[in-house]
Amino acid sequence: IYLKSYIHGFFIFSMLINPVDLLLWTFRRNENDVVKLYDALSPIMEVSTGGDMLNFGFWDETTLHPVDAQKRLCEMMGDMAQISSAEIIADIGSGILGPAKIWNSQYPSLQISSVNVNFSQLASVEPSNISKLNSTARMLPFSNSSLDRVIALESAQHFKPIGDFFSESNRVLKDDGILALAIPTATENSNLSNLGILKF
């Protein structure tokens, strides 16, 4: 299958994706399948949106561009997770750190650890004051009761079994800590053209 991104009147990117791989991604068996999926699709998603986030975002009638929807979702997650009152957070399944960069710019004193099973995504990001940890969501690399917030922004749907992630989040969160999740959904009346980065 050839995928092309159409931005500002130009075809920017063309890539061959094996249809068998596409089918196998639908029936992910383990974390390596998710890594392969994002290794193949991340460049397309970045070029298609012009941004550094890999989420669908939050769309409404006023949303005009995928990057606007993505930024809006990050800000909403930050508000819902109450990161303004947090000191130490972990962004699990962090991709290429787009959301963490937004939160870091809004809250410079916030200590952010980005946890991702995909080493190549972490390695592709320029060094910053955001900690990058290559680890699975099933065994979080934090001590007991050490985090104020655990955030999984459109990543928890990949954590298999998700119960392990919930147990680990409970272990690493302080007693008053918050686990915040955003999982992509579509309503029956969703317009497929608004899927932005994944409308192929």
What do these predicted ranges mean?
Residues 13-47:
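N-terminal auxiliary segments of SAM/dcSAM-dependent transferases
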Residues 64-85:
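Conserved alpha-helix/loop element of class I SAM-dependent methyltransferases that forms part
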Residues 88-139:
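Class I SAM-dependent methyltransferase SAM/SAH-binding core
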Residues 138-150:
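A short acidic, Gly/Pro-enriched loop at the edge of an enzyme's catalytic core
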Residues 149-161:
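A short SAM/SAH-binding and catalytic strip from SAM-dependent methyltransferases
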